[in-house]
Amino acid sequence: MSSIVVVGTQWGDEGKGKITDFLAEQSDVIARFSGGNNAGHTIQFGGETYKLHLVPSGIFYKDKLAVIGNGVVVDPVALLKELDGLNERGIPTSNLRISNRAQVILPYHLAQDEYEERLRGDNKIGTTKKGIGPAYVDKVQRIGIRMADLLEKETFERLLKSNIEYKQAYFKGMFNETCPSFDDIFEEYYAAGQRLKEFVTDTSKILDDAFVADEKVLFEGAQGVMLDIDHGTYPFVTSSNPIAGNVTVGTGVGPTFVSKVIGVCKAYTSRVGDGPFPTELFDEDGHHIREVGREYGTTTGRPRRVGWFDSVVLRHSRRVSGITDLSINSIDVLTGLDTVKICTAYELDGKEITEYPANLDQLKRCKPIFEELPGWTEDVTNVRTLEELPENARKYLERISELCNVQISIFSVGPDREQTNLLKELW
């Protein structure tokens, strides 16, 4: 048995989907373990581009299982729209499996997300307003509705009526707004559940069977470590745990099942939404990176904030996620810059620190300490080995590996599959 966890080491959008797809060819099962349809990833398959939000990357391989684990929050209507879109383009989806313990996102979660963000005013978090946070809140409050409940008509009716009564009082008191009614929700979402019924099962058992059969399992992360509810830039984070350790909770397998953890990063840094970003760029270099790298959110379409590579962030991610191997994407985006920079430490109140602060106010006062390296002008998009890279590009990657104390096992010089290069066998 072998398994690999793929996690983002920054604030999401690192290219995890492409790396997951790249590794999926040799795996038997691909499983998601956190997040919801707030996570967007772009996949190149069969010469076409696909943008997925809930469906695991493994859906494109009909001989492999694509699993949505119990740690994922599922909007049934959004999921069906995604599945229908794939079917219309000739992609079969019969290999999908959904955990019967996954929480369901309902219309009142989307409304609550909108109202709460509005109430925050200038302190808004930058939520995608997909209902993710409120769904996880209901899970912890033990009033959440799970996929297993959605499939049973009487159970769903009883729980939905109870929740709407609670939400109506909450919405009125907190926002002076009304909650979507029972009639607005019940028939549409029960019907959606019935359409998804064939996919719903105990996915923990599927994964356990795969391990017993000595199959290869790939765990697909969403967002990034710096958006982790515990280890990220709190409170500007997501509502779940994208770190590798959440594989055990989010899919129902034991920690001994994990063999390797691949941390995916860009050769620079990007972020969507609000929150601290010590190496953020506002100059021509930032404009170059955003436009050449097409830095616009898959889910929101919002322009991403961009900045220099931050080794303080990556060291933090390596430690809290147990990263064994590094995949560096988008090296080609930096081509043409005279100088490239790596943040090696921060200056906080006149002192140099090398670890990421937990306190938000301290983080806002941090100034990046940069190491400058010469850039390169040579086209790298057809490079297939480290040795073929321009010397300056190769030294840049080697310095990142050295600063972060993790080996580079994959590097990518463009968006296409053939531009993703494996430096060592991972399975």
Swiss-Prot record:
Reaction it catalyzes: IMP + L-aspartate + GTP = N(6)-(1,2-dicarboxyethyl)-AMP + GDP + phosphate + 2 H(+)
GO biological process: 'de novo' AMP biosynthetic process; IMP metabolic process
Binding residues annotated for GTP, in chain numbering: 12-18, 40-42, 304, 330-332, 412-414
GO CC terms, sorted: cytoplasm
Pathway(s) the chain acts in: Purine metabolism; AMP biosynthesis via de novo pathway; AMP from IMP: step 1/2
Residues binding IMP: D13, E14, G15, K16, N38, A39, G40, H41, T128, R142, Q223, T238, R302
Annotated substrate binding sites: T298, T299, T300, G301, R302, P303, R304
Cofactor notes: Binds 1 Mg(2+) ion per subunit.
UniProt keywords, alphabetically: Cytoplasm, GTP-binding, Ligase, Magnesium, Metal-binding, Nucleotide-binding, Purine biosynthesis
Pfam families: Adenylsucc_synt
Residues bound to Mg(2+): D13, G40
Superkingdom: Bacteria
Entry-linked InterPro entries: Adenylosuccin_syn_GTP-bd, Adenylosuccin_syn_Lys_AS, Adenylosuccinate_synth_dom1, Adenylosuccinate_synth_dom2, Adenylosuccinate_synth_dom3, Adenylosuccinate_synthetase, P-loop_NTPase
EC number of this enzyme: 6.3.4.4
Cofactor: Mg(2+)
GO molecular function, one term: GTP binding
Enzyme class: ligase
Active site: D13 (proton acceptor), H41 (proton donor)
Major location (coarse): cytoplasm
Protein family according to the UniProt entry: Belongs to the adenylosuccinate synthetase family.
Biological function: Plays an important role in the de novo pathway of purine nucleotide biosynthesis. Catalyzes the first committed step in the biosynthesis of AMP from IMP.
Matching HAMAP family: Adenylosucc_synth
Subunit structure: Homodimer.
The protein's name: Adenylosuccinate synthetase
Organism: Staphylococcus aureus (strain COL)
Gene for this chain: purA
